Design a protein with these regions (language model features):
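Membrane-proximal intracellular helices of multi-pass ion channels
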Residues: 1-436
Length: 436
C-alpha cells in the first residue's frame, strides 16, 4: 500500500515536469504523460491491494519498505528517459535514475545540453527528492493514511544514532522538509542574482541541496566561470552536509547546542584543514593565484566531502599528492542525518575517541574510559555497530576494486569507481574524475 502511495506521488512529479515541457513547447510533455499514466495505474492497483492491511510497521517491515521503495521509484522514474528514447537502453535508463534518486550523480550521458528542459528538470528533481530520502517525505504523509512511520525512519536514517526533535516522527519529518525546501528556495534566488536563468537556478539548487551533482551543463558549474556562483554553491553544499536535526536547532535559536555539537565541529574543522592544505599546495604547484587556489580547493573539498560531485576544475591535473587527500575526503563524508554519502563524520568522531581510549588503556589498563559525545555516553553496542560498519564499508571497497581490476579496469579508476558508488559521490579518480 505504501509503495502504491509513493508511486502516486511520483506521478504528481511527472505532471510537474510535463508543465516545464509545456512552458518550453517541447515534445517530451507526452513522454511524461505516458509515464505518469503507467505509474498511476500501478500505484492505484498496489494501494487497492494493500487496503485493510496492517497499519503498524515492524523494524523488519521498515527495512523491506525502504529497499523496495528505492527500487520501485527508480524503475518507474526511468520511464520518461526510456519512453522518449533519450536513454534507449533499459539498463542505462535505470542506472541514470537510480543515480539521481540515490544522489550519487554518476551519469551515462555525454551530451546533456541536447536534452529537452522537462527531462533535465526531472533528472535534477530525482536528486532533490532522493537526497533527503523518498522515505523521509513519505513519513511526513503516512499519518494521513493511519500508518506509523517510526520503523521507516529507523531504516532510512544514515547515522549510528537517530535524533528526533519532536516525539511524533511525522512532525519532525515535516519540519526537516520545510527547512530543506527553504534552503533550496533561498539558493535559487541567490543563483539568479549571479546571472543564472530561473531554470538552471532551480536545477542546480536541486542538485546542491540534494548533494547529487547533476548539472544542466556538460562542464558542470565550471561552465559559468563565475567566482560568485562557485562561492554560493560551496556555502550551500556545506549547509546541506549538516545534520538536519542540527539545522532545526539553529532555526529554533538553540545556538549553543548547535555550535557545541561534536560532529559539526569535526565537519567544519575537516573542511578548513583540507581546504587550507590543498590551497597552499595548489598555490605553489600550479599557475593559480592565491584567491583562485583557495576557491578551487574550497569548492572541490566541500563538493567531494558532501558527495555532491560538482566540478569547477579537473583535479586529476593537480599534483598527485592531492589525489590521496581528496580520496580521504570522499571516504569520510559529511554529517549523519544529512543528504550526503560516505562514512559520515559522527563515525569518524567515534573512531577517533575509541582509538584515543585504546592508547590510554596501554598506560592505564584498568581504567574505565567510556566514549562520550556531546556529554552523552555512547553505548558499547553503538560503538560495535560503528566498528562493524566501517569494516564492512572498507571491505566492500577493497573487494569491489579487485573485481573491477580483474575485469581489466586500471587500479586508479577501479578504486575511484567503487569509492564513488558506495559513497554516492559521482566523480571518481583517473578517467572517472569528471564524468563517471
Amino acid at each position: 500500500r505504501i509503495i502504491g502511495i509513493l508511486l502516486l506521488l511520483e506521478t504528481v512529479m511527472f505532471l510537474v515536469c510535463s508543465g516545464v515541457s509545456f512552458y518550453y513547447r517541447e515534445s517530451d510533455m507526452l513522454d511524461f504523460w505516458k509515464a505518469g499514466g503507467i505509474t498511476a495505474g500501478v500505484g492505484l492497483l498496489l494501494a487497492a491491494l494493500g487496503k485493510g492491511g496492517e497499519r503498524q510497521l515492524t523494524r523488519r517491515d521498515g527495512y523491506v519498505l525502504v529497499s523496495f521503495a528505492w527500487v520501485a521509484f527508480s524503475l518507474f522514474g526511468m520511464l520518461p528517459f526510456y519512453i522518449g528514447g533519450y536513454i534507449p537502453d533499459i539498463a542505462n535508463a535505470f542506472f541514470e535514475t537510480m543515480s539521481g534518486f540515490s544522489s550519487t550523480g554518476a551519469t551515462i550521458l555525454d551530451d546533456i545540453e541536447s536534452l529537452p528542459h522537462g527531462i533535465l528538470f526531472w533528472r535534477s528533481m530525482t536528486q532533490w527528492i532522493g537526497g533527503l530520502g523518498i522515505i523521509m517525505f513519505t513519513i511526513a504523509v503516512l499519518p494521513i493514511f493511519g500508518v506509523s512511520g517510526l520503523q521507516v525512519f529507523a531504516a532510512e536514517a544514515s547515522g549510528p544514532t537517530h535524533d528526533k526533535v519532536h516525539p511524533r516522527i511525522g512532525i519532525t519529518a515535516k519540519w526537516i522538509w520545510s527547512i530543506y525546501a527553504g534552503i533550496t528556495a533561498l539558493l535559487v534566488g541567490l543563483l539568479m542574482l549571479g546571472g543564472m536563468d530561473w531554470f538552471d537556478s532551480i536545477c542546480h539548487a536541486f542538485a546542491t541541496t540534494g548533494t547529487g551533482g547533476f548539472s544542466t551543463k556538460q562542464a558542470s558549474v565550471a561552465y559559468y566561470n563565475s567566482p560568485y556562483i562557485e562561492y554560493v554553491i560551496s556555502i550551500f553544499m556545506f549547509i546541506s552536509g549538516i545534520n538536519f536535526t542540527l539545522l532545526l536547532l539553529f532555526v529554533n535559536r538553540k545556538f549553543k547546542k548547535f555550535i557545541g555539537n561534536a560532529e559539526l565541529k569535526f565537519y567544519f574543522g575537516s573542511v578548513v584543514l583540507f581546504t587550507a592544505v590543498i590551497a597552499i599546495v595548489l598555490y605553489y604547484t600550479s599557475p593559480m593565484g592565491m584567491e583562485e587556489s583557495f576557491r578551487k580547493s574550497l569548492f572541490q573539498v566541500i563538493s567531494l566531502q558532501t558527495s555532491t560531485g560538482f566540478a569547477t576544475d579537473d583535479y586529476m591535473q593537480w599534483t598527485p599528492v592531492l589525489w590521496g587527500l581528496l580520496t580521504i575526503i570522499m571516504l569520510m563524508g559529511a554529517c549523519a542525518g544529512s543528504t550526503t554519502g560516505g562514512l559520515k563524520c559522527i563515525r569518524m568522531v567515534i573512531l577517533t575517541k575509541v582509538s584515543r581510549n585504546e592508547f590510554k588503556h596501554i598506560l592505564h589498563p584498568n581504567a574505565i574510559l567510556p566514549v562520550r559525545i556531546n556529554k552523552q555516553v555512547i553505548s558499547p553496542s553503538i560503538v560495535s555497530t560503528v566498528l562493524a560498519f566501517c569494516f564492512i564499508y572498507i571491505s566492500i571497497i577493497v573487494i569491489g576494486t579487485l573485481l573491477m581490476m580483474a575485469m581489466g579496469v586500471g587500479a586508479e579508476e577501479s578504486m575511484g569507481c567503487v569509492i564513488s558508488s558506495i559513497g554516492n559521490m559521482g566523480p571518481g579518480l583517473g578517467k572517472t574524475c569528471l564524468l563517471y
